[in-house]
Amino acid sequence: MNKRWFALLGCLLFCASLAAPAQNLDAVLTSMDRAAASFHSVQTDFNADMYQKVVNEHDYQKGTMYFRKQGDSIEMAANITDPDKKYVVFSNGVVSYYQPSINQVTEYNAGKNRAEVESYLVLGLGGGGHALTNSYDVQYAGMEQVQGVSAAKLALTPKSQRVHNMFQTITLWIDPARGVPVQQRFDEPSGDYRITKYSDIRINQKLPNDAFKLKTDSHTKVVKPNG
């Protein structure tokens, strides 16, 4: 899948020892399973650091993200407030990227990749724990302090070569008390990476009525690169 998907979804878009006790990993995955069983929605603030190795540059973003799961339907929205206002919405298999500065919406249809895109959206958040082992080799890498939370660090290595070509490793820092991530890191083979920290996480609370609607007007231009 084109990396552009994940650059957008990431806006959105919330390995140490092989000898670590197996029950620790199982306990973390079980807490994630419990959280997924009752998961309907989440609102969270985020801070993201996107690093490009070839130019040795960091791109920082912050804002608020929203997730909603109804049956098999998944929606996500990211309101980026800094450094520039931008908005991303994933709904009905379509990623819509709104740039108010040029009053333009760019739409990408996930098409046959919809299920895969949705699986990344709920990675560690509403997607369950033990289900991760179907697609990843999962290692428990101990506990680390992340924004005042003692979080369980899980290192995921994709089993699929195609996914591994995009992400060498994916690391999740899980709050074991709530079974949700407080930090995620996606490492690409090129040396590029994205780290996202989540704070003020509100689970299953009422979301704004317009959380998944772009605030466009009659003059907004819509571009569809892949039809």
Protein language model annotation of sequence segments:
Residues A16-N24:
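Bacterial Sec-dependent signal peptides at the C-terminal "C-region" and cleavage site
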Residues L25-Y97:
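N-terminal mature ectodomain segment of secretory-pathway/periplasmic proteins
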Residues D26-A27, G129-Q139, T196:
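A short, amphipathic edge element
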Residues T81, Q99-S101, R185-E188:
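Beta-turn initiation residues at beta-strand->coil junctions
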Residues Y97-G124:
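Acidic/charged, solvent-exposed loop-and-adjacent secondary-structure segments enriched in E/D, K/R, S/T
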